[in-house]
């Protein structure tokens, strides 16, 4: 896991000390190198995850749109069928009464 920003800043401030021993300077630089590697790795993982989720979201939007269109067509067909049923129930008596 990458270093927290405060930890990273502490290491950088430590490196500014001109009296810092070479071994400590090497260790601090190594920590920064490892931190950078883990940061890049985590960034790449998150980018891949984001791309995957974005693609899944797009697929779901398309599927949802298709379902809404299908439901809309089904509802319209039911309304048309109800209208047809109503028109078929008119009897001669109904016509004579009008």
UniProtKB/Swiss-Prot annotation:
Name by which UniProt lists this protein: Capsid assembly scaffolding protein
One term under GO cellular component: viral scaffold
Family membership noted in the UniProt record: Belongs to the phi29likevirus scaffolding protein family.
Gene this chain is encoded by: 7
Coiled-coil residue windows: 40-62
Highest taxon in the source lineage: Viruses
GO biological process assignments: virion assembly
A single MF term (Gene Ontology): DNA binding
Keywords: Coiled coil, DNA-binding, Late protein, Viral capsid assembly, Viral release from host cell
Self-association and partners: Homodimer. Interacts non-specifically with DNA; probably binds DNA in the early stages of DNA packaging.
Function: Scaffolding protein involved in the icosahedric procapsid assembly. Coassembles with the capsid proteins to form the procapsid. The scaffolding protein is found within the capsid as a serie of concentric shells. During DNA packaging, the scaffolding protein molecules are released from the procapsid.
InterPro entries reported for this sequence: Gp7, Phage_phi-29_Gp7
């Amino acid at each position: 896991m990458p270093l927290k920003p405060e930890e990273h800043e502490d290491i950088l401030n430590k490196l500014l000390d001109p009296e810092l021993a070479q071994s400590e300077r090497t260790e601090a630089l190594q920590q920064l190198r490892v931190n950078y590697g883990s940061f890049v790795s985590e960034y790449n993982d998150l980018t891949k995850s984001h791309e995957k989720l974005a693609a899944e979201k797009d697929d779901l939007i398309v599927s949802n749109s298709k379902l809404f269109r299908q439901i809309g067509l089904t509802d319209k067909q039911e309304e048309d069928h109800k209208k047809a049923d109503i028109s078929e129930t008119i009897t001669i008596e109904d016509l004579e009464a009008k």
